[in-house]
């Protein structure tokens, strides 16, 4: 089965009305536009999203819906650094330092709280800066992502040479 577009999200439906099968994804797999996965019930699916969300797939995104059958995204819990800033200045410092490392940064559950995937160097940096943090297991959902840039991403358009293209050597 090839999935080319999202159908919606489970938060907009009553999941109890449907037979929901899940594709379990790691947080870093949610930004893939082309991939193959197996659902919990063993169905093979291929994803080739034409209009992929800029932030990536989110918890509960519906990949397939037919009558009472749904295949939806489940983002697996992973080891995450929960960061609690004490001031606006500390928020700026956290965003600068995490961004400087090109690490993913997500909104937390409360004001001035952020999450980033666990990496020892990032944890050491936060300790050195005196920023309050704790390592917990939680979901990194794309809809809560602060950073949008996708290094090494493929363009969402086709490139072709114009009919009047010429190479001139001098």
From Swiss-Prot:
CDD domains: UreE
GO molecular function, one term: unfolded protein binding
Top-level division of the source organism's lineage: Bacteria
Subcellular location: Cytoplasm
Biological processes per GO annotation: protein folding; protein-containing complex assembly; urea metabolic process
Alphabetic keyword roster: Chaperone, Cytoplasm, Nickel
Pfam families, per database record: UreE_C (PF05194), UreE_N (PF02814)
GO annotation, cellular component aspect: cytoplasm
InterPro entries: UreE, UreE_C_dom, UreE_N, UreE_N_sf
Reported function: Involved in urease metallocenter assembly. Binds nickel. Probably functions as a nickel donor during metallocenter assembly.
Family stated for the protein in its record: Belongs to the UreE family.
The name this protein goes by in its record: Urease accessory protein UreE
Protein source organism: Helicobacter pylori (strain P12)
């Amino acid at each position: 089965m090839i999935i080319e577009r999202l159908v919606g999200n489970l938060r907009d439906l009553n999941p109890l009305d449907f037979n929901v099968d899940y594709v379990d994804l790691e947080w870093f797999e949610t930004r893939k536009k082309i991939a193959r996965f197996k659902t919990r019930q063993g169905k093979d699916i291929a994803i080739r999203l034409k209009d992929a969300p800029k932030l990536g797939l989110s918890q509960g995104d519906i990949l397939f819906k037919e009558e009472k059958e749904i295949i939806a995204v489940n983002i697996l819990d992973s080891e995450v650094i929960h960061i609690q800033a004490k001031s606006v200045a500390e928020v700026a410092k956290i965003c600068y330092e995490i961004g400087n490392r090109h690490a993913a940064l997500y909104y937390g559950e409360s004001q001035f709280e952020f999450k980033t995937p666990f990496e020892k160097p990032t944890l050491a940096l936060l300790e050195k800066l005196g920023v309050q943090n704790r390592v917990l297991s939680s979901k990194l959902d794309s809809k809560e992502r602060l950073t949008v840039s996708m290094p090494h991403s493929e363009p969402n358009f086709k490139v072709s040479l114009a009919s009047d293209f010429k190479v001139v050597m001098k």
